[in-house]
Every structure is written in structure tokens, then in C-alpha cells.
Amino acid sequence: MGEVEIDSQRQLYIHSHIITYGHAATPQLTDQIRDEIETMWNEPHALINIQSTAVIVRFKITAEFKQHISDIEVYQNDDPRNNYFRIEEFALGNISFVDGINCNSGFFKLENLYKGSTTAAHEYGHTIGLDHPKDLDIRGKGTPGIMYPRGTLVDPQFQYDPSKPAGTKGGTMHPMHRKVLRADIVNLKLHKIRFRNNKAIIGEFTNVYHLPHM
């Protein structure tokens, strides 16, 4: 989730603030998550049209580690920039997840957050409105976009093991090969957002405070 702002220089900024908590959260990991999201989502340098004006889309991501955050603070949040993610070594289903398409909360499994994993950038995409693509066989179509999930069929160089046949163990997309493409920015449909005084909101409040999984 984030706050969208258009400035006088024809730049559209999406501001999001990542707040982490949980037994596996650390200041260093929090900054790594922030950097991954900001770096990857700014890579396309995408130009889009808003009200017949070409604007460049930029993401400004800040982050904060709040070890002792309370459930009340999360539940009562009314700042559209704030996104809350619990980080733990154990997660039910063995996956990281967010609380729906268009949301501002979720649960990250520590193992999924290694440097270059693209997990944080992928889950952030869900918070601002993007779902997994329907066609999960993109062989012959090049680099997978950021919203493709694990299990997607891709060209060999994007697999866990390029020597494996597609669809077998090792023969599916390695998440580290995902990239944020211009198409991902276009899919945000920013031109349909209603602005007021050059500001708008992308995503929705879910404000879920997650407990550790047992």
C-alpha cells in the first residue's frame, strides 16, 4: 500500500513505509527489504500517461524495525504509507504471504528473504494491487516479471537448474530471476486512480497484526 503523489516536475511518486516486527526481524534485514523493493520497482524507469500528461513513475520506500509494536498500533493505523510485516523462521505453508491483493500487512518467512530473493518486491506488488498472472507457462517469452509465482515454466536460463526438463524438480522458475518490468507498472493502472490535490492512495487498509505461527 502507498500514497501516490504527482509533483510539478511531472514525476509520480509512490511512497510506502515498511514496518517489520517478529522474532526474526532485524534492522539489517528491514533495510535489505526496503532496498530490494525500492531498487527493483524503480528499475523500469517507466513513463505512463496521467490525464494526457506523460509522467515518470518512481518509488520512494522507507522502512522501520519495530520489535515491540503493539496490535493496537497496527489495528488503528490510518497512514496509507504504512505496511506491516511479521518475520519469523517458521510460517504455516512454508511460504511468505500478504493479506490479499491491495493490502498493507503480511507474514514473511525468514528463509524466503535471502539477498536477491525478490520475495519482498513480489509481495509488495500484491499490496499495491497486482495478482499472479494467469498464464504460468512463459517459455519463449524471456525474463519473468516480478509477479510470477514459484512453479512458473520459464526458459532454461531462468530455472533453478537449466539442465532439467521444464516442470520437473529444478525445472521451474528460480525467483531470483524475476524483474520488475514496464508491464508491471502499466498493470497498476495508475491512470484510473482518483487524485485529490495531486495525491491518491494505492492499495487498501487491512492492518492485520499477525501472531507467530505454531
Question: What is each stretch, according to the model?
Answer:
Residues 27-139:
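Metzincin-family zinc-dependent endopeptidase catalytic domain
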Residues 19-24, 37, 134, 153-154:
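Solvent-exposed loop/turn segments at secondary-structure junctions
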